[in-house]
Amino acid sequence: MKASKYILPTEKENPADAVVASHRLMIRAGLVRKSSAGLYFYLPLGLKVLKKIEQIVREEMNSTGALEFDLPILTPSDFWEQSGRWSAMGKEMFRIQDRHDLSYALGPTHEESFSFLLKPLLKSYKDLPVNVYQIQTKFRDEIRPRFGVIRSREFIMKDAYSFHIDDSSLDDTYQAMRVAYRKIFDRCGLKTIPVQADSGSMGGSASEEFMVVSPIGEETLLLCNSCGYSSNSEKTPLILKKENGSAKFSEKKEISTPGKKTISEVSTLLGVSESETIKAVALKSEKKKILVFLRGDLELNLHKLHSLLKIADSEPMTDLEIRELGLIPGFISPIAPNDKIKVLYDRSLQKDFPYVVGSSKEDFHTQGFILEKEISGLPEFADVALAREGDLCPNCSSPLKAEKGIEVGHIFKLGDKYTKAFGIQVLDQNGKSKTLTTGCYGIGVNRTMATVIEQCNDEKGIFWPISIAPFEVSLVSIVKGEDQYSKIEEFYNVLINEGIEVFWDDRDLGPGFKLKDSELIGFPIRITIGKKFFESGEISIYNRKKDQEDSFVFSGFDDLVARVESMRQELFTELR
């Protein structure tokens, strides 16, 4: 491809609204342009990268025996009603009505559609297992799209769904997908960590996210350097490093705390650590009022709470709603007020420790409150607090380390949630009807592209892994006149005929501009032919990742091609 025939709108300045490297560089390198919040146009260079990632995904999926489909983006509301997710998906799902007032969703995921499609096609255990997938545009009405294509409202996703006669078969495919995902991300040049994760609205019994450690990540990972345990903090069981020792206040007594409603305010006033207090969190879901008590220095983990109570979402109660239950905001006692509210105690609490708690009385707290003495029939404590760095590994009890991560893939064991909802049964070996069990496996293609840039950039721009670079080789020519141009064109044609992907910057621009563009865009290999070649036969070849340039005297096209092939193989080998 010749740059003179290409759309190549590179930019010198960073876009004002771009706060992360991938967003800045995708705009500056001419890969994308913004349409509106969370929506992007893909230009030819950016589209080539996307298509290469898609092809890697397709090859690895096909190698496992998965079958590619293409389903409608519009999905009828009936499908979602049948699974119970029409309301559970909330406001993030785009919903539309046609001229006949029929409701549809712009698919954020396709469990329902594949279930509807495959129900009449799967009749016997002999038809199983089957793993189906598509690579398709998905939609999500993000409340705050940000970080460019990392969190956007429209994105390309590979979503796969497997159907099985039993859990053993499901586990075989789950493990095959786990291996395939590692291969996909390795081939894309990404270093990923599989971590245990919460299944969220997807449901199911097991779930792993493929995470890339990055300071811009929106997820917190907790990792153990001793045994290799890794988990999303949403899923990590809380095991505290140590419990409270002796308390400052052991005698039970009511204390005046005028206007002090927060844990920080109360602990500062009384001179106690936050871990010696009990925090009350009042929430409401669609059908429940919830009151959670946990140690004052900890945060509530909503994902654990929702999973435990089997609810889709919750939000804080207002002060008025709290008072209507007979409670005083900021001064709530751990004693359950009535049966109108679901009360939970986190396992971070010690039953025999004298805590500072709310007194159920305006401007008063109680010191020396011991749960097992004050609350009759104390229930079993639940794990609903958020684990943090320094808490203990659930496998080996070593301290956990926290890292930020970007999720690029996710695999689930869904069980029979959707096959039950859609009545998907087959005859087993004994001729009896059996409900199938399923798995789900997703990869964000655009997000993978952006995350590669987050890992592969420097002050000059992007340095693409050669497997997904828009072109493998950049040929930069610095010439005067038609004769010199024709000579460089001979080089270009030789490389093309050897099957090498070449982007020839033949624009009538200065050498500095061309060289900076090639480094900004991130072509893995650059060949520069200019004045020195026409004077002494000297050519330079540049490794973008190493930022290393070597010169040699041209001795023939075979030698040039051999040098390029050697560097290509070196760059591909680094991905294994």
Swiss-Prot record:
Name this protein carries in UniProt: Proline--tRNA ligase
Cellular component terms (Gene Ontology): cytosol
Q: Which CDD domains match?
A: ProRS-INS, ProRS_anticodon_short, ProRS_core_prok
State what this protein does: Catalyzes the attachment of proline to tRNA(Pro) in a two-step reaction: proline is first activated by ATP to form Pro-AMP and then transferred to the acceptor end of tRNA(Pro). As ProRS can inadvertently accommodate and process non-cognate amino acids such as alanine and cysteine, to avoid such errors it has two additional distinct editing activities against alanine. One activity is designated as 'pretransfer' editing and involves the tRNA(Pro)-independent hydrolysis of activated Ala-AMP.
Main subcellular localisation: cytoplasm
Q: Which domain of life is it from?
A: Bacteria
Q: How does it assemble?
A: Homodimer.
For the protein in the UniProt heading, the enzyme class is ligase
Write out the similarity annotation: Belongs to the class-II aminoacyl-tRNA synthetase family. ProS type 1 subfamily.
According to its UniProt record, the EC number is: 6.1.1.15
Q: Which GO terms describe its biological process?
A: prolyl-tRNA aminoacylation
Q: Which UniProt keywords apply?
A: Aminoacyl-tRNA synthetase, ATP-binding, Cytoplasm, Ligase, Nucleotide-binding, Protein biosynthesis
Say if the entry is tagged with keyword Transmembrane helix. no
Which NCBIfam families does the UniProt entry name for this protein?
A: PRK09194.1, proS_fam_II
Localization in the cell: Cytoplasm
Q: Which Gene3D superfamilies match?
A: Anticodon-binding domain (3.40.50.800), Bira Bifunctional Protein, Domain 2 (3.30.930.10)
- Please give the InterPro entries that the UniProt record associates with this protein: aa-tRNA-synt_IIb, aa-tRNA-synth_II, aa-tRNA-synth_II/BPL/LPL, Anticodon-bd, Anticodon-bd_dom_sf, Pro-tRNA-ligase_IIa, Pro-tRNA-synth_IIa_bac-type, Pro-tRNA-Synthase_IIa_type1
Q: Which Gene Ontology terms cover its molecular function?
A: aminoacyl-tRNA deacylase activity; ATP binding; proline-tRNA ligase activity
Species lineage, top-down?
Bacteria, Pseudomonadati, Spirochaetota, Spirochaetia, Leptospirales
Catalytic activity annotation: tRNA(Pro) + L-proline + ATP = L-prolyl-tRNA(Pro) + AMP + diphosphate
About its domains, the entry says: Consists of three domains: the N-terminal catalytic domain, the editing domain and the C-terminal anticodon-binding domain.
